[in-house]
């Protein structure tokens, strides 16, 4: 965590475009490199990779869907990485499937303050359980699913 730099305006620019494939591809590549180049005793034993988006892919230039899917599959199969996909204003299950992320790890969420806060609460609980348990916990993600079912899509 100490190695993570604060986000700046240059790092994050909201402009109506979603370069989702590039964001996922770059981040998987960087994190995989860090894992492989870190001494084994300091390397993360488990990796939980969370993707949160409120829009469809419409602006990537570096990575294709197939390339990202291949990268994700490699990390899942060779290193046991777990991927979670949270999406608003899209079909999260369908989008996640394009990247090789299973339906039980893909959740639609309500894109408002309460829905976003619930995302972070659920991911915090998932991470805590993930660190202490062998299988990936499903209960925290179920809260997001219930919220979506109860309150529906909001813009």
Question: What residues fall within each predicted segment?
Answer:
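Acidic, low-complexity intrinsically disordered regions
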Residues: 1-155
């Amino acid at each position: 965590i100490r190695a993570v730099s604060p986000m700046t305006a240059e790092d994050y620019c909201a402009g109506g475009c979603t370069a989702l494939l590039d964001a996922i591809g770059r981040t998987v590549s960087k994190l995989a490199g860090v894992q492989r180049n870190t001494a084994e005793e300091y390397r993360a034993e488990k990796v939980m990779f969370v993707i949160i988006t409120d829009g469809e892919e419409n602006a990537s230039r570096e990575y294709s869907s197939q390339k990202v899917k291949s990268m994700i599959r490699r990390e899942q199969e060779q290193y046991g990485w777990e991927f979670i996909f949270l999406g608003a204003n899209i079909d999260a299950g369908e989008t996640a499937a394009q990247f090789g992320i299973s339906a039980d790890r893909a959740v639609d969420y309500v894109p408002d303050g309460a829905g976003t806060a619930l995302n972070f609460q659920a991911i915090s609980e998932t991470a805590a359980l993930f660190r202490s348990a062998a299988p990936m916990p499903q209960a925290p993600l179920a809260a997001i699913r219930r919220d979506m079912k109860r309150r529906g899509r909001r813009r």
